[in-house]
């Protein structure tokens, strides 16, 4: 069985138009990953009066290549740029139109938000919400979801959907990867009813869940059957918080947290390679984080998240790539800042971190005992 990833899929099926090969789950991931590309001044912003103004995928790819920015970008944006180049090669996507591009970073309100529309040749619209980028700011907002709803990007996602979608009756698919998947669901739940009726599918590609109160909303229950949550076998991000929908598990060629990268997900023909269940590693981490988070009250969650963010920013870390590129310097800076934290904050961080490590240890022991029982019983 020959398998590949979304890049290979574009090579295999890039010249199949949507009348021959209808929209599928792999197309969803391609368009979800596309929103990570740096398309400022390449794809038009939302227009007044919901006017559709955009550029074709082939034109956007030409402009992006001419700008030279892909080579200067972080890996996440680079991969999305290369994906756009590949999309432009075949008739499946080359004439699709990109528009309503937004890319916003608000450090004061701790918000990172990016999205775009893809007007497809099958006369549908795909609204793609970007996940968390390389900034510490973006990850801070993700962590805020552990105690806050809505976070600024969730509110922005609803406003974006309601104000930018043309009122022409076309059917809409909405999706995103990582935090983008969470935003896709949130916007679909909270938008006005007439718009909601046009939404046919909502794709959450390894995105975090919600606080329990979200799942109890009538508006969530109403659209629940239109949600597809897709996660890799060792999903970590996609298992955070609560999910009211079932999920599909896909094979990944990467290990651990690196499976979060959608380019590692395995594709066979026009679908993902599916598995029956998540890996034992994912289950252990899920149990650990779930028990640990539930053991913290809202005040402790806020204090811990704020302390981690303060530690990173004071150490001069603005991007995750800083940690990789200047690892020794940054770790040294973090150690210095740890000692400069107020005594109460430092004590709180040590206590909560110890609780996390302890819970992980307990779950590892449970896994080992479970494996032994299965072996003894010949399972």
Language-model segments: residues:
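Alpha/beta hydrolase fold serine-hydrolase catalytic domain that processes acyl esters and thioesters
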Residues: 1-116, 120-125, 129-146, 150-159, ...
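Short glycine-enriched nucleophile-adjacent loop
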Residues: 184-193
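Gly/Ala-rich beta-loop-alpha elbow adjacent to hydrolase catalytic centers
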Residues: 175-180, 184
């Amino acid at each position: 069985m020959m398998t590949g990833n979304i890049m290979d899929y574009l090579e295999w099926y890039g010249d199949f138009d949507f009348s021959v090969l209808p929209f599928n789950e792999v197309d969803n991931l391609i368009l979800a990953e596309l929103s990570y590309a740096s398309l400022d001044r390449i794809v038009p912003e939302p227009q007044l009066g919901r006017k559709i103004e955009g550029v074709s995928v082939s034109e956007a790819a030409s402009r992006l290549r001419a700008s030279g920015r892909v080579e200067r970008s972080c890996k996440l944006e680079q991969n999305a740029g290369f994906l756009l180049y590949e999309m432009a090669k075949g008739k499946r996507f080359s004439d699709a139109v990109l528009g309503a591009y937004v890319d916003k970073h608000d450090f004061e309100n701790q918000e990172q938000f990016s999205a775009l529309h893809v007007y497809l040749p099958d006369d549908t619209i795909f609204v793609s919400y970007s996940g968390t980028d390389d900034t510490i700011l973006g990850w801070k907002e993700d962590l805020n979801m552990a105690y806050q709803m809505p976070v600024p990007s969730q509110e922005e996602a609803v406003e974006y959907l309601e104000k930018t979608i043309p009122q022409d009756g076309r059917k809409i698919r909405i999706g995103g990867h990582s935090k983008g998947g969470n935003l896709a669901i949130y916007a679909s739940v909270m938008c006005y009813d007439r718009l909601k009726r046009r939404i046919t599918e909502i794709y959450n590609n390894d995105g975090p869940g919600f606080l329990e109160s979200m799942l109890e909303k009538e508006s969530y229950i109403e659209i629940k059957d239109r949600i597809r949550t897709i996660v890799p076998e060792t999903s970590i991000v996609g298992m955070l918080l609560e999910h009211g929908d079932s999920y599909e598990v896909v094979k990944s060629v990467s290990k651990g947290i690196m499976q979060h990268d959608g380019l590692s997900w395995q594709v066979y023909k026009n679908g993902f390679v599916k598995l029956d269940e998540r890996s034992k590693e994912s289950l252990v981490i899920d149990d650990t984080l779930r028990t640990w988070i539930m053991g913290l009250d809202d005040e402790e969650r806020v204090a811990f998240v704020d302390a981690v963010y303060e530690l990173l920013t004071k150490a001069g870390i603005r991007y995750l790539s800083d940690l990789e590129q200047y690892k020794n310097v940054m770790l040294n800076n973090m150690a210095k800042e740890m000692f400069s934290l107020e005594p109460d904050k430092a004590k709180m961080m040590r206590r909560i971190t110890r609780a996390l490590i302890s819970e992980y240890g307990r779950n590892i022991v449970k896994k080992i005992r479970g494996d032994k029982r299965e072996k003894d019983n010949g399972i």
